[in-house]
Amino acid sequence: MQKKLTGKCWIFILVCLCLSGCFYAGASSRSVSVVTWNVQTFFDANTSGSEYSDFIRSKQWGVQAYEARLKRLCEVMRQLDADIYVFEEIENKDILIDISNELSGFSWNQRKNWNYALFAKNESGAIGCAVLSRFPLSEPTVHNLDVRTEREKQPELRPVIRLKVLVNDTQLVLFVNHWKSKSGGAEKTEVWRNWQESLLSSLMKKDFERGAYILAAGDFNRDISEFNFCGDCNDDSGIVVLGGEVPVYSPWFFGGVLEEPGSYYYNDSWERIDHFFASQNIAFLEFRAATGVWCEDSGIPARYKIYTGQGYSDHLPLFCRICLDEVNTECS
């Protein structure tokens, strides 16, 4: 089999988004909170031609609708108050600048602002992934697949993004993922998610072998039950073996039981397709699929509806607080 890292990508890193100063969270703790959230086709109000057709055709979509949606996203960010946000389905870097401008006036403490940001997507892609952080970001790399050994042509696949986050004096290696959807059939498209898993595991293995603190986050479009688990572990251990060689922990088993209900609601059924996967030298202090005003009364995600301008996303945000210390002696 052949695997190449190739393709043209846009990668953009912003440092000190707020003009009034650049600080990072300065406590000595190794504790850090992270949210990963698929924000559901988050386009801006400018038409570049790569947008999905329902946004291009819609008479309801424009500056006013975009600004209203942006405000709601920022309200969720303030409410969850995570140190790091990993977003899937962001159109471009300009949205990160708009987020920063929207948030900059709400905190007198610059250490509480998200002064660091990154955006990346393939040149031909409509949407990409973004990171906003209170901690400095560095050394971003984008990794694509070029598979030519399958019977069918490789579809458009989003890249894996690797970057480093300096959490006070401790380095966290963060991998951002948005894997192939099941559109076109779960079984038929599984081969491409397998390839993406192989790519991620090969990248993680290098950091794993040097004892780094590693966290993979994103929308994997694969339920936790569909991953391969450690054969010698208890069923509720939460130890997933990525690519058959990299053992990582899934907090969907936080507390020793499978967390309910899930993060994505489709065809009247909950799924757990959004994930954190962590090296085992990281301790999880909290984990949840966060609920709030971004949910319907029933608790399911309030998906964004372009024809009404209402809603948030068809996914729930996943929240975790982790300690970059496996015995949890360095976290408050």
What does each model-identified segment do?
Residues 167-197, 202, 207:
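Metal-dependent phosphoester/phosphodiester hydrolase catalytic core
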Residues 23, 155, 202-215, 221-332:
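Metal-dependent phosphoester-hydrolase catalytic domains
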Residues 40, 90-91, 178-180, 220-223:
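Catalytic metal-binding/acid-base residues of hydrolase active sites
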Residues 90-171, 179:
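Structured beta-strand-rich core segments of catalytic domains in phosphoester-bond hydrolases
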Residues 11-21:
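Bacterial N-terminal signal peptides
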Residues 58-64, 81-89, 117-119, 149-151, ...:
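Second-shell loop/turn segments in exported
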Residues 22-106, 121-122, 324-331:
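N-terminal, active-site-proximal structural segment of metallo-dependent hydrolase catalytic domains
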Residues 28-34, 43, 155-181, 324-327:
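Beta-strand-turn-beta hairpins that frame and shape the catalytic cleft
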